[in-house]
Amino acid sequence: MARYLGPKLKLSRREGTDLFLKSGVRAIDTKCKIEQAPGQHGARKPRLSDYGVQLREKQKVRRIYGVLERQFRNYYKEAARLKGNTGENLLALLEGRLDNVVYRMGFGATRAEARQLVSHKAIMVNGRVVNIASYQVSPNDVVSIREKAKKQSRVKAALELAEQREKPTWLEVDAGKMEGTFKRKPERSDLSADINEHLIVELYSK
């Protein structure tokens, strides 16, 4: 399945919520009619079945983290194998992706931009270049920007933007050095309450 390359706001309107696909800290509902479906007049949203609601939630989370369907299913399988709550395990795995950590640390304005930094070999983990976006960052790992990439205007702009966002408590970032430490895996209370991971578990449990 190919990665979606179309308008980002269209996806957010389809899901009826901000997927944080665009840079900036201004709420997306000030940029577009988030409650209105894509289209000139906004297609009327049909009443969804339980399955439809579960599917929409899965699609929403998958798009937030920029993960393809097969990858997402594999994350679910891994989450189900781990001890503890499957839904919370799933979110922890998604949050542990290197591209997401780079975004959370403020080195990329969006997850897509962070993913590009990783693929362009601008990111190091514990002093070693890692160019795999899905690489799982472990507690106490140090993530940093390579020296030659520190002068990139997009990195500096992203860091300025990050100053306006709430800083994740599970990360420790030194903006001056352009590096950060992944102190621990985030707990459920650290993450967005707008995600209903139990719906995804119900979907895949069928």
UniProtKB/Swiss-Prot annotation:
GO terms for cellular component: cytoplasm; cytosol; cytosolic small ribosomal subunit; small ribosomal subunit. GO terms for biological process: cytoplasmic translation; DNA-templated transcription termination; maintenance of translational fidelity; negative regulation of translational initiation; response to antibiotic; ribosomal small subunit assembly; ribosomal small subunit biogenesis; transcription antitermination. It comes from the Bacteria. The keyword Repressor applies. GO terms for molecular function: mRNA 5'-UTR binding; mRNA regulatory element binding translation repressor activity; rRNA binding; structural constituent of ribosome. InterPro entries: Ribosomal_uS4, Ribosomal_uS4_bac-type, Ribosomal_uS4_CS, Ribosomal_uS4_N, S4_RNA-bd, S4_RNA-bd_sf. The keyword Metal-binding does not apply. Gene3D superfamilies: Ribosomal Protein S4 Delta 41, Chain A, domain 1, RNA-binding S4 domain. Disulfide bonds: none annotated. PROSITE patterns: RIBOSOMAL_S4, S4. Keywords: Antibiotic resistance, Repressor, Ribonucleoprotein, Ribosomal protein, Ribosome biogenesis, RNA-binding, rRNA-binding, Transcription, Transcription antitermination, Transcription regulation, Transcription termination, Translation regulation. It holds the Pfam family Ribosomal_S4. Residues 96-156 form the S4 RNA-binding domain. Part of the 30S ribosomal subunit. Contacts protein S5. With proteins S3 and S5 encircles the mRNA as it enters the ribosome, which may play a role in mRNA helicase processivity. Some nascent polypeptide chains are able to cross-link to this protein in situ. The rRNA transcription and antitermination complex (rrnTAC) consists of RNAP, NusA, NusB, NusE (rpsJ), NusG, SubB, ribosomal protein S4, DNA and precursor rRNA; S4 is more flexible than other subunits. NCBIfam families: PRK05327.1, rpsD_bact. One of two assembly initiator proteins for the 30S subunit, it binds directly to 16S rRNA where it nucleates assembly of the body of the 30S subunit. Belongs to the universal ribosomal protein uS4 family. This is Small ribosomal subunit protein uS4. It comes from Escherichia coli (strain K12).
